[in-house]
Amino acid sequence: MKKDLHPDYHVINVVMTNGTTFQTKSTWGKEGDTINLDIDPTSHPAWTGGNQHLLDRGGRVSRFKDKFKGFA
C-alpha cells in the first residue's frame, strides 16, 4: 500500500438532533472532533412519516422562492 495515499481514518463524536451522542470512524475532521447533525433518522420525514420541512440555511430557500415567486 502506498504511503500518504489514503486519508486519516479516526474516531469522531456524532450528536443527533435529540441530543444522543455516539462515536464512529470517519475521515471527517480530526480525532475526537464533534459533528452536530441537522437531520438524522429520528427527525427526517422519510423515517418519521411526518411532513417534509425545509431548512433555510443561509437564506438560500428564501432567495430561491423570491426569484421564482411569479413562475408557476
Curated annotation (Swiss-Prot):
BP GO annotations: translation
Entry keyword set: Ribonucleoprotein, Ribosomal protein, RNA-binding, rRNA-binding
Highest taxon above the source species: Bacteria
Keyword Ribonucleoprotein: yes
PROSITE patterns tied to this protein: RIBOSOMAL_L31
Any Gene Ontology CC annotation: ribosome
Intrachain S-S bonds: none
Signal sequence coordinates: none
Pfam families reported in the protein's UniProt record: Ribosomal_L31 (PF01197)
Molecular-function GO term, any one: structural constituent of ribosome
InterPro entries, per the entry: Ribosomal_bL28/bL31-like_sf (IPR034704), Ribosomal_bL31 (IPR002150), Ribosomal_bL31_A (IPR027491), Ribosomal_bL31_sf (IPR042105)
Function, as annotated: Binds the 23S rRNA.
NCBIfam families membership: L31 (TIGR00105), PRK00528.1 (NF001809)
Quaternary structure note: Part of the 50S ribosomal subunit.
Similarity annotation: Belongs to the bacterial ribosomal protein bL31 family. Type A subfamily.
Protein name, entry field: Large ribosomal subunit protein bL31
Taxonomic lineage from the root: Bacteria, Pseudomonadati, Pseudomonadota, Alphaproteobacteria, Maricaulales
Gene (name only): rpmE
